[in-house]
Amino acid sequence: MMMTRLETLKNNLQAAFGQDLALTESLGELTLEVAAEQWFSACTKLRTDPALRFESCIDLCGVDYLTWGNGTQPEEKTGPVTRGRYAVVVHLLSIEHNWRLRVRTWAPDDEFPMVSSLLECWPGVNWFEREAFDLYGIVFEGHPDLRRILTDYGFIGHPFRKDFPLSGTVEMRYDPEQKRVIYQPVTIDPREITPRVVREDSYGMGR
């Protein structure tokens, strides 16, 4: 009986990583968990191993798990199940073998999240890492030009963090007296957003 492509990839990952392999499967997709200290070496192996050959990194992003497991519905309140607050995720493609893989690592320090840059492994992640730094504040050690890429250079904070205020912290406007754009604290009154109430399936029945 012939193995499927997914089974072949599983076996090849097992052979490459041995006891260090932490692999999960969901919806026909594989996710490889890698410790932060092995992030660069593991990704290098994924790219260079002839049995894997993930020569293309099609996406890199940050994730903030601050409120993970705290849903609005009772059945969604599973509590924290993560290894940390911030994660970095890459989606890889092997053109040679025609398969894909998701790889995730966790920043060990929630106060100063930092992982190794993958720029030497996949040069195309340059702006991806800058975006994750800009939006989440994740530092990529070894990146030669880790600057903001979407927000203004004077922007305060990282807007995709779960605890970033919806109204922001700074606003800018044109000052007719100074005849230039100026920055000032936000003048929007903060407000609490109440989640919508989801009615039960049986609501209104029996009336």
UniProtKB/Swiss-Prot annotation:
Family under the similarity heading: Belongs to the complex I 30 kDa subunit family.
EC number: 7.1.1.-
InterPro entries assigned to the protein according to its UniProt record, in alphabetical order: NADH_DH_suC, NADH_quin_OxRdtase_su_C/D-like, NADH_UbQ_OxRdtase_30kDa_su, NADH_UbQ_OxRdtase_CS
Membrane-topology descriptor: Peripheral membrane protein
Entry's Gene Ontology cellular component terms: plasma membrane
Superkingdom of origin: Bacteria
Keyword terms of this UniProt record: Cell inner membrane, Cell membrane, Membrane, NAD, Quinone, Translocase, Transport, Ubiquinone
Record's protein name: NADH-quinone oxidoreductase subunit C
Annotated function: NDH-1 shuttles electrons from NADH, via FMN and iron-sulfur (Fe-S) centers, to quinones in the respiratory chain. The immediate electron acceptor for the enzyme in this species is believed to be ubiquinone. Couples the redox reaction to proton translocation (for every two electrons transferred, four hydrogen ions are translocated across the cytoplasmic membrane), and thus conserves the redox energy in a proton gradient.
Record field: catalytic activity: a quinone + NADH + 5 H(+)(in) = a quinol + NAD(+) + 4 H(+)(out)
GO molecular function, one term: NADH:ubiquinone reductase (non-electrogenic) activity
Organism: Bordetella pertussis (strain Tohama I / ATCC BAA-589 / NCTC 13251)
UniProt cross-references to NCBIfam families, sorted A to Z: NuoC_fam, PRK06074.1-1
Compartments where found: Cell inner membrane
Subunit-level organization: NDH-1 is composed of 14 different subunits. Subunits NuoB, C, D, E, F, and G constitute the peripheral sector of the complex.
PANTHER family to which the protein is assigned, alphabetical: NADH DEHYDROGENASE [UBIQUINONE] IRON-SULFUR PROTEIN 3, MITOCHONDRIAL, NADH DEHYDROGENASE UBIQUINONE IRON-SULFUR PROTEIN 3
